Every structure is written in C-alpha cells, then in structure tokens.
Amino acid sequence: MSLKCETERSKTWNNFGNGIPCVLGIDEAGRGPVLGPMVYAAAISPLDQNVELKNLGVDDSKALNEAKREEIFNKMNEDEDIQQIIAYALRCLSPELISCSMLKRQKYSLNEVSHEAAITLIRDALACNVNVVEIKVDTVGPKATYQAKLEKLFPGISICVTEKADSLFPIVSAASIAAKVTRDSRLRNWQFREKNIKVPDAGYGSGYPGDPNTKKFLQLSVEPVFGFCSLVRSSWKTASTIVEKRCVPGSWEDDEEEGKSQSKRMTSWMVPKNETEVVPKRNVYFKERHMSNILTF
C-alpha cells in the first residue's frame, strides 16, 4: 500500500538562484478524477525572469494541448538555459493515500490533504536555500482562509491565493504544466500490483468519473470481496456506489457501535462507589464466536 509521499525535485531546485529573490507558484493536477494520483507542483523562478517565462510559452495547462505541455516540460528538464530560469518540485499523492485520508476515523478532507502538500513544497524550497520572497497559489477552498493560513506559517513572504492563478501568473502556469504532465504520465504508465485486473481494450481513459472508458473500467475491475485495485480512489462516491451495488455485503466488529460516541468519560473506567467490581464489555469478536475466558488450566 502506497501511503508515503516523497518530494521529487528537478536538477536545479536545491540552492536555486544562489540567493536571488524568487517567486514560487503552486498548482495541482488530478483533483477530480476517480483514478490515479493527485500531483502537486511548485515552480520557482527569479523575480526578474517573468518575461523569459512567458517566452517559454507557459500557460494554464488546460489551455495547452498535450504535445505543447510535454515540449515545455522537457525543456524544463533538459535545457540548461531554461533550468537557470525555472526549477520545480512535485508531490505525487497516491489514490490509496487520498482514500485512507478521507476514510479514516478522523477524516481528513481533500482540501486538508491539498493544503498539506502545498505547505510541504513551500517548506522544502526554503529548506533547500531558495530565497522565496513571493508565493502565488491557485486556491483550494475559501481563498481568504487559505491565504491567512499560509501567511501565519510563512511570515515575511508576500502571498497571493486566488482563483485562476494558473492563468494569471506565469510561475503558477509552469507549476500547472509540471503537475499535469507528471499526472498524465503516471496514469498512462500505471503498474498494477494486483493480478488479473481487467482493463478495456480502449484503456481506462482520463480517470474522470464522466469518461466512458473510466466508467467501463470501474465496472469491469471491481472485485466482489475486496473492491477496487490501488489505481482507484475508493473514497470517491463514484467508486463507493459501485461497491455497494456489486460487492458482497460485509460487517465490521464495531458496526454495533455505529452512531454511538466513541469517547468515554475518564470516570467510566473507575469503580462506582456502590459496586466492588466492574464487568468490562465483551468485544463483539468474542461474542460472535461464543468464546469465554478460561479461569483454570
């Protein structure tokens, strides 16, 4: 199970700019799909290189075709002159990490997962000795709240959180391209750990719930007992609905506690004044199996 997320960095990310004031932009790709990872990217560039960034052709990744996005991303990785203008770092959040975050007892929303990824990337840039003086972020959730959160964490840095940042700021456009190309590549070249996964001849598509190929893949690949493979975000309503309809019903040991408070008063563990002994409640596991304590051997 892939629940770890490592920061991936381009060649010139460490000590980028050698102390020159830089702007950092953040964007993501793959927030909405039911298949594949969500990729967060941060791009950095000297403040005085805005024109050069535009000349590179960066734009909102959704406004560029696949060939153009890959051309720009390849230059970011292979052209030594371009690497002096821009560097980037990525965090690739697996479907399993997303699902586990959203389904665990203390639920962690997708917005919280996204914020953590962005904050980790900013901290990584600072730890790698990048002189970040401005940050531009494409908003996730209420922008004022998000901006206030970042300003509290990173005082002294000018921060702008806004909608459509990927089309307003070239540095965010560059981050958008890095995230989108990486996400598409990881999805296209996905290696299944599970055996005998049924993939339609036309493939599993873009991963978005409305994609006909994605819909077909979900219907074909669901396993009656174990549900979906690691490519699928099981926390998505699209996936959970199929599981409810197609999979064998199951129950968990704590089902009988559903709807009841999981917390107890501290005094509930103490012996009441009127009783000499407290009989602990038997776990449902032992009840269902008619198991008893052995008092003598």
UniProtKB/Swiss-Prot annotation:
A divalent metal cation binds at D27, E28, D138. Keywords: Endonuclease, Hydrolase, Metal-binding, Nuclease. This is Ribonuclease H2 subunit A. CDD domains: RNase_HII_eukaryota_like. It is an enzyme of class 3 (hydrolase). It catalyses: Endonucleolytic cleavage to 5'-phosphomonoester. It comes from the Eukaryota. Residues 21-248 form the RNase H type-2 domain. One of its GO terms (molecular function) is RNA-DNA hybrid ribonuclease activity. Its cofactor is Mn(2+); Mg(2+). Its EC number is 3.1.26.4. It comes from Caenorhabditis elegans. Catalytic subunit of RNase HII, an endonuclease that specifically degrades the RNA of RNA:DNA hybrids. Participates in DNA replication, possibly by mediating the removal of lagging-strand Okazaki fragment RNA primers during DNA replication. Mediates the excision of single ribonucleotides from DNA:RNA duplexes. PANTHER family: RIBONUCLEASE H2 SUBUNIT A. One of its GO terms (biological process) is mismatch repair. It holds the Pfam family RNase_HII. Manganese or magnesium. Binds 1 divalent metal ion per monomer in the absence of substrate. May bind a second metal ion after substrate binding.
